[in-house]
């Protein structure tokens, strides 16, 4: 019943783009508080020759690594995911996720840690990577809160966010004026915390992410350098 209700809500909550998408690439330092050294992360969005977009994220540290890639297209201002792949190794159990979004058959087909996944598909449903682009665009549009329907494991979950305000983030690229956003979770269900900062003057590029897991372990990425639409990101200097 709950899944059917969430699916029906997609008809009323289609993520739409505030502006034309801009390709970007960014490098980050990555810190896991439980490990003594920093790692690195790369995030990029590029448009392919056939018009589809590819969003890629890679992070590595010592023996741990994560790769995440989504492909999607834009149709009348709406994001339509096509494929999603995630591969995580180290730091406990590995994880592999594959999802294919079949818009002709209106279904999502894939696997999550070896278990088959099959879900109904309609416009408005996003994967765990593409929703980040929708959030980035909604923040650019000035929204103070936003919700997305996301394929999460073998279910469709609602991801809620709210804007906390503006904040200056000190990065290796300089001081960046950013909009601070947090993931809203039911504290009776999860004490996990996620906060994101998006650059106001650089296409609302993600400049910082801080996450606290349910076991108290912390993870953070912080911008080192990047480009938006081919222009190097340059913050203010002290």
Where does each model-flagged region fall?
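Positively charged n-region of N-terminal signal peptides that target proteins for export
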Residues: 1-4
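Sec-dependent N-terminal signal peptides
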Residues: 6-9
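N-terminal signal peptide c-region/cleavage motif recognized by signal peptidases
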Residues: 13-15
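Acidic, serine/threonine-rich low-complexity disordered tracts
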Residues: 19-103, 140-238
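Hydrophobic, well-structured mid-protein blocks that either form specific transmembrane helices
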Residues: 94-140
